[in-house]
Amino acid sequence: GVTFVQLREKNLDEESFYREAIEIKELCKKFHVPFIINDNVELAKKVDADGIHVGQNDMAAQDVRAIIGPDKILGVSTQTVEEALLAQKMGADYLGVGAVFPTGSKDDCWVLSHDLCREICSAVTIPVVAIGGINLGNISKLSGLGFSGISLISAIFGQDDIKSAVMKLKEEVSKIF
């Protein structure tokens, strides 16, 4: 199965988001999988999530770290070497870098070159996770770029048989990382 869960909900009201977060947190706890929340620092604190992931247009990494403390996971989205180095300096535990391929789950992103991805991965000492447009057909193209892992949405949730999709993806991932 999966090794890390990030709850990313852009269209839910606060109460529905809270209920969903509690439900997913309990499921993650049952399977010993870290659970983080995207963008919503207050909700992450309220449900005692394992961490938070923020983008470049959200709260600054150092401010998030000050709120969540040293023991929670902090992930930061980056698209340049400069952003990556700053996020690491400000307390990020890992980076989400991309989009590495065209994606339908985020409207305002551009696709990074694989050379730039390699540069970002080489510039920092914390884990770097590839994000954006990754699927069974293109995952092998990430080999050798320096990523520590991948982040998936539609490659899992857009499939008719989610369990089968996860197993096939996990097999491919094991060849790369």
Segments (PLM) and residue ranges:
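Long, low-complexity, intrinsically disordered polar/charged segments
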Residues: 1-14, 88, 92-99, 121, ...
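N-terminal active-site wall of soluble small-molecule enzyme domains
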Residues: 4-70
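Structural motif corresponding to alpha-helix initiation and N-cap regions
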Residues: 14, 38, 58-61, 80-81, ...
